[in-house]
């Protein structure tokens, strides 16, 4: 803070607290530490902000606002996969339903909308938003376009898709019916929607 830092990005903060016998994700102690971190920062520099990077299901992501006493900003991780899904399947049903269900940001908080990152297209943020058949169709399409799928598996559970490793431009080069000449238009449309 003394050096002029005003923005603190907490990367993968959902995994901050480790406790044996748990998934070590979104534990109450993590939220307590974020509240404490924000309190200390605000006492020292009232205009400093905390941004959380939590690539988790939407409901869990929203919890990182707390009661406007945790993160000032959270990344809207559900937007990229829902937007790609809408543009390659031709249906905006899931994207529209999600958008209409999002609560407005509380006073003093903000959503960071983005449509691509260096991490690929995360799929945990669409758990509970896209049906399994929709995710499977998206995975098949992205693999046809050269994408690779990263998987996650907890002990004793079935492997689940974690993220699609593909550039946004490549992800939008066609539809579920295959590649076509409208990829650039889809890419521009994604930016216009964002």
Predicted regions: what they are:
Residues 1-194:
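Active-site and adjacent substrate-binding regions of carbohydrate-active enzymes
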């Amino acid at each position: 803070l003394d050096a002029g830092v005003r923005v603190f990005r907490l990367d993968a903060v959902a995994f901050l607290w480790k406790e044996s016998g748990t998934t070590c994700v979104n534990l109450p102690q993590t939220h307590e530490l974020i509240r404490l971190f924000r309190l200390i920062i605000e006492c020292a520099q009232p205009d400093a902000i905390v941004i959380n990077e939590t690539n988790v299901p939407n409901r869990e992501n929203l919890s990182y606002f707390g009661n406007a006493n945790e993160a000032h900003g959270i990344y809207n991780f559900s937007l990229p996969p829902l937007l790609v899904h809408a543009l390659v399947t031709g249906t905006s049903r899931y994207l529209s339903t999600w958008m209409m269900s999002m609560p407005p940001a509380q006073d003093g908080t903000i959503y960071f909308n983005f449509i691509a990152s260096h991490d690929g297209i995360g799929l945990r943020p669409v758990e509970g938003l896209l049906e399994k058949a929709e995710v499977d169709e998206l995975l098949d399409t992205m693999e046809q376009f050269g994408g690779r799928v990263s998987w996650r598996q907890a002990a004793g559970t079935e492997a689940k898709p974690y993220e699609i490793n593909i550039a946004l431009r490549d992800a939008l080069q066609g539809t579920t019916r295959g590649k076509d000449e409208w990829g650039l238009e889809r890419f521009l449309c994604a930016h216009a929607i964002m």
